[in-house]
Amino acid sequence: MDAAAWSDKVPLFETAKGKDNTLGFTIGTPQIGRVSIKRETDGSAKLNENIRYAGFLASGYAAEEKDAAANETALYVYEMLGKEVGTGEKRGQAAGKPGDQLAKIVVKGGVGGLSTPTLLDTDFDGVVDFAFAGDRGGNMYRFDLRAASPKDWTAVKIFSGSPNKPITSAPAVSRKGTKEYVVIFGTGSEIYQSDLSNTETQSIYGIFQKLDQAPKDLAADKTNQDVAEQNLRKQTITEVEQSYNDGNNQPRTSKALYLSNEKIEETHKGWFINLGSGERVSIKPTMILRTAIVTIRKYTSDGGKTIGKEEAEKDLCMPVSNNKSTVTSTTFLGINADNGGALNSRSARFTPDIFKRELSGFGTQYANGLTQEGIVSFTFIDPNKRTDDPVTADGDSGETGTDKELGLGSGTPNNRCFSGKEGDQRSLLLNNAQSLEVKGRICGLQRISWRELFF
């Protein structure tokens, strides 16, 4: 290929410059989903036409200072292919061009720039209905994509946070019931050098959302909006040192984390958990059944050690250096998405069974989390996953995979138990050559009715 023609031949498109494009540093992950650009008044989508592949890009961060005028808090939505992708006769025909801006949804009162969005398909028809994203002011927003036209797509604040608790990663979404969800996210930043020494208390939040109303009614329903921390149930973390024998029957000790299990009352709009000093969340949580696995990082730096100072006082040509080291740890915390609390035998969990205990009023509680040294990440491996559908059982449309035909979902997916049989090896595969076995409830035959037979 002619190198001079690279910019014209290789990229599918380049976003237009100008007043409608004030993107900052977009360090987040763009999302791709199918959207309807012409919906009915009740918010429903016709699947045979007016469906497009859209790219969702957060505005990012233009300046480190959160209140800087250069920081715009907005969600950009772009036409990806410039073709109709509905199921009707117009499928594949030209419809605009790649890179056209379908919408730019500016968040009023946004702080510090928008972070990576999460896309949600509530009815599993293959069309995205909502997006959720947070800003560096600690606020979480809901973007309703069900209006008649993209120009009418709206954003409302569902949680009011604090600039001391920035949201720099995408939220997870847990499907609690029919069009009832928990939006789960953590706070904290590891973007700027100043973040390294920041010890402000960060938190994990779960905000309840009921999305069963038409667009205008939902926008007017204040019970789903502007929730504050005082409206949430607080859960707490306890660290316990456990003694056990390893596979070689050698005595070992390890620290396990347990969450409280405070009851959610009708007045609560969700839950929250405060983290320890220096801990923060900068990665999207992973949903496994009804358990949210949150990755927590902690950075501890020493004051530095000056080398060569005495020699330099005698000889000005001798170099002086300052060595500073940082120790990192990673905690994986499994959280009951419904109340932010304890895990039982029916919950998806990854901690060894030796770390279980009895909790008053709850029964057998399995440890919620473990801590390891270093920067550790994981991939969830399930041998019984039969498809590469990018839409999860919760409706999160941000996974990798191959889209199904529109409307070809097989009903509401199961997110309460694993398919397969006892003994199947599910695991969190870690990047440090370790793995953690994942256990939980296995789906099986159940009695749904009975009657007595007389002979």
Regions found by a protein language model. Name each.
Residues 1-455:
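Beta-propeller fold recognition
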